[in-house]
């Protein structure tokens, strides 16, 4: 508009159409690292001691499931793992006892205390799995049980008058026992792990590894890893859950070298070079359970108990349970389980059907 000339309506309208300049978005400030030594002691590091004291006072839950054909030493291995009779003895099994016609779920609870810390351990056994002539869909009762524990936890979680500490019966770890054939995995092995790895942390183990030579064991481990990779089966610890480079480096070594753990279990002690050791007596000598030159039991124990126990619990809660919870609430219109949109009762999420395996 020319200087000195009155502003017209057109000029005014055009000026209204011109957008005002947008303010620049605020740049988020990077967190500053402050050396507390300059300010005096604060006490942040005491949180670790606070957590330790609370854990010692309340204890913690750990629920482990064992799955595999009968005769693979599942009960013996779990007893060896926790150095307690936490599962029924293999020696107490009656040879005349009938094999269950269907898969059964048996949970046994124990309290183990070590160094002032109490662990409320539950061992879930699955007698009858894989022992039938027709093993079609024999994993469904196991998946149903796992989902039922998620359902129990969810109902307590959304309860208005919920308990201060919700009882945790969710399965944190599933040890899947592979028969030491030295050849390849059975279709049932592949179908079980492919299906159940989506709902629980599966750790594959080769049972009774002392029946194979070192060369046979190494080749079988490589073959199992290859078959799992080809079939798109991810076992714990899954790559996608690695939180940082340190986790990735540590877990890659486990995934590429240790898995599946070739183990031997025994609750019997023998004298070897003046020391009492857990082992199995064979015509060729004593197989020492905790000797890494003999088997990988010590690696499995360290992995499950000493380095990854807390992570097993966290992945169960943050990944598997949250997946179930989101699906359950989504199917229920966002309402608590048990109530539909019009007050109708909804059934629990059923086991997902999967391909036939014999």
Curated annotation (Swiss-Prot):
The modification Phosphoserine is found at residue 91. Residues 1-10 have a biased composition (Basic and acidic residues). It is found in: Cytoplasm; Cytoplasm, Cytoskeleton; Synapse. Its main location: cytoplasm. It holds the Pfam family Septin. InterPro entries: G_SEPTIN_dom (IPR030379), P-loop_NTPase (IPR027417), Septin (IPR016491), Septin3 (IPR008114). Residues 68-75 are annotated as: G1 motif. Belongs to the TRAFAC class TrmE-Era-EngA-EngB-Septin-like GTPase superfamily. Septin GTPase family. This is Neuronal-specific septin-3.
């Amino acid at each position: 508009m020319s200087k000195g000339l009155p502003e017209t309506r057109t000029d005014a309208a055009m000026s209204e159409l011109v957008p005002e300049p947008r303010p620049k978005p605020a740049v988020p400030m990077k967190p500053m690292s402050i050396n507390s030594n300059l300010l005096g002691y604060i006490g942040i590091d005491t949180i670790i001691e606070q957590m330790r004291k609370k854990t010692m006072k309340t204890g913690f839950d750990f629920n482990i499931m064992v799955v595999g054909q009968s005769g693979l030493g599942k009960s013996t291995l779990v007893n060896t793992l926790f150095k307690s009779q936490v599962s029924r003895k293999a020696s107490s099994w009656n040879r005349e006892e009938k094999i269950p016609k269907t898969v059964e779920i048996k949970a046994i609870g124990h309290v183990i205390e070590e160094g002032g810390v109490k662990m409320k351990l539950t061992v879930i056994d699955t007698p009858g799995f894989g022992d039938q002539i027709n093993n079609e869909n024999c994993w469904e009762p196991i998946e149903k049980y796992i989902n039922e524990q998620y359902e129990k936890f969810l109902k307590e979680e959304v309860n208005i008058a919920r308990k201060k500490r919700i009882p945790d019966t969710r399965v944190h770890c599933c040890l899947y026992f592979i028969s030491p054939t030295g050849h390849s995995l059975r279709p049932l092995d592949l179908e079980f792990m492919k299906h159940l790895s989506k709902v629980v942390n599966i750790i594959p183990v080769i049972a009774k590894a002392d029946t194979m030579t070192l060369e046979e064991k190494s080749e079988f481990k490589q073959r199992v890893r290859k078959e799992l990779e080809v079939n798109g089966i991810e076992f714990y610890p899954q790559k996608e859950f690695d939180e940082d480079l340190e986790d990735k480096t540590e877990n890659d070594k486990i995934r590429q070298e240790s898995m599946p753990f070739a183990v031997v279990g025994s609750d019997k002690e023998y004298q070897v070079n003046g020391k009492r050791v857990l082992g199995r007596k064979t015509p060729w000598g004593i197989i020492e359970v905790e000797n890494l030159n003999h088997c990988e039991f010590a690696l499995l124990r360290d992995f499950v108990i000493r380095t990854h126990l807390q992570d097993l619990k966290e992945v169960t809660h943050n990944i598997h349970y949250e997946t179930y919870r989101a699906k359950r609430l989504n199917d229920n219109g966002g309402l608590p389980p048990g109530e539909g949109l019009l007050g109708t009762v909804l059934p629990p999420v059923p086991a997902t059907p999967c391909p036939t395996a014999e």
